[in-house]
Amino acid sequence: MGKIIGIDLGTTNSCVAVLDGGKARVIENAEGDRTTPSIIAYTDDEIIVGQPAKRQAVTNPTNTFFAIKRLIGRRFKDDEVQRDVNIMPFKIIGADNGDAWVESRGNKMAPPQVSAEILKKMKKTAEDFLGEEVTEAVITVPAYFNDSQRQATKDAGRIAGLDVKRIINEPTAAALAYGIDKKQGDNIVAVYDLGGGTFDISIIEIDSNDGDQTFEVLATNGDTHLGGEDFDNRMINYLADEFKKDQGLDLRRDPLAMQRLKEAAEKAKIELSSTNHTEVNLPYITADASGPKHLVVKITRAKLESLVEDLIQRTLEPLKVALADADLSISDINEVILVGGQTRMPKVQEAVTNFFGKEPRKDVNPDEAVAVGAAIQAGVLSGEVKDVLLLDVTPLSLGIETMGSVMTKLIEKNTTIPTKAQQVFSTADDNQSAVTIHVLQGERKQASANKSLGQFNLEGIEPAPRGQPQVEVMFDIDADGILHVSATDKKTGKKQNITIKASSGLSDEEVEQMVRDAEAHADEDAKFEELVQARNQADGLAHSTKKQVEEAGDALASDEKEKIEAAIATLETAIKGKDKEAIDTATQALIEASAKLMEIAQAKAQGEAEGQAHDAGQEKPADDVVDAEFEEVKDDKK
């Protein structure tokens, strides 16, 4: 059985870990980094992921996608999406089904399709480390993700060629990473998770007793559209406003300038966590009729804190709600864990310390803890980790729309999962032969104010006066937090089942098509990699052969020289094309054409070696320098 890997699919950065000798290990990617920027770029002939994609973003802003997680499982008309439409350098569009999609070079793509490229990079990173194929994964999501967002994340895994064995909440994963080595006692832990695009708070009880550990989530709350990207956007808007005041030009209309501004804002924000002031200096940021313009703005930590103060305050209300839902007071919290890169900001740490009345722990890596926890959960599923029980919850209430456009809840928020619930409903009209089951997720009484997860009809109900037919609706939430619904006419036994997909979302056919596309791209990518290797080898051969021709001088006959130069020219032409076979053929032709060169080079090397040996024999040096002179002869031979 192959390894199950743990993946933290983050808004800003992603991370992959695996159990290695019973311990979770974060795996370095091909660039040698332990985290990978969640950035995907589409060029003419390839898809670039991670740090290489980030490096080229300034020159390719409209085809470089970041923070895609903020769009996953969302509708285009959502207020949060509309805010992003106005500030992102790439194009966010409404799909035919109403979902938020993106567009690159005329191709429309669903967020799970784009996110799958990051998951593929994580999969390849793990495979390179393990030396074997990886097909199974545990993927983390924000605790406050709704059903649509969880389903979309599983879809991304399928498109990437992964069987997603479990979806696990990020704060729960962080608690696993923190608590797995705490062998005794009962601890109540608050996990404050402020990442790149989402915020979660989870109250978790860790019970360690005689080697058995139970991680029970007591309550969770959060905001799926609040994170480091919003902090960056405040800084971006401030810099753009300052530039407009100074120069009268609005940088928001220039995607290239906005991409440079984004990078500078993120860098300045990070610097201000360890220093009190910094300067953003972007020469040639734009130009007008009078010439090029430069942006130079000094910014202090105090200014940044004033720009984001309300964002930090927005994280505190969910803390109060989560404590109330868990029926706990602040004094009941034993430890506070910070997760997510944005928690490195001193003002965030100060706000959390003031709220809980205690310093957060510093021994949890905010960038890696979630992936480590996912790897531990993977170990639990594979049987490698024993005596660990994880009890997670559903973050939002689930129910159906009933008469008067009211949401009737079947499963309350913070219910431990997996779970089932059923309730009997009846008809609203006389002789009604069908009922529509409209499934909702949220906390509002008014049905329309909640998230619609989908609807289906139960038909064939026998005509009867209103209120007499009995329809049993059953909700079943699996361990991934994904909902399955059935409705049964108790008299006839007729039943209708669905696994809830959002009223939008991707159909199975669309996901399968994307899986096939991804597999086709994998072949394309492999061929492209082979082409690049062939080009590089050929280029190196052409360069070294030219040098050898020069060094050979008159020792090389003119007809031989012409033959070699013609072969070099043919190879250089082939390198510019995209035909690997043509490059390989031209490479072999040059190797054969330059056989005479090799003879000349070998003869020259042999002559030099004999000359040096003769010189060494003529001169009898002292014993203590013989070894050094012998070394010199060897080096020359090389």
Swiss-Prot record:
GO terms for molecular function: ATP binding; ATP-dependent protein folding chaperone; unfolded protein binding. Residues 624-638 have a biased composition (Acidic residues). The modification Phosphothreonine is found at T198. Residues 539-559, 602-638 are annotated as: Disordered. Pfam families: HSP70. Induction: By stress conditions e.g. heat shock. Disulfide bonds: none annotated. It comes from the Bacteria. The keyword Zinc does not apply. Keywords: ATP-binding, Chaperone, Nucleotide-binding, Phosphoprotein, Stress response. Residues 611-623 have a biased composition (Basic and acidic residues). The keyword Nucleotide-binding applies. NCBIfam families: PRK00290.1, PRK05183.1, prok_dnaK. Belongs to the heat shock protein 70 family. Acts as a chaperone. PANTHER family: HEAT SHOCK PROTEIN 70KDA. This is Chaperone protein DnaK.
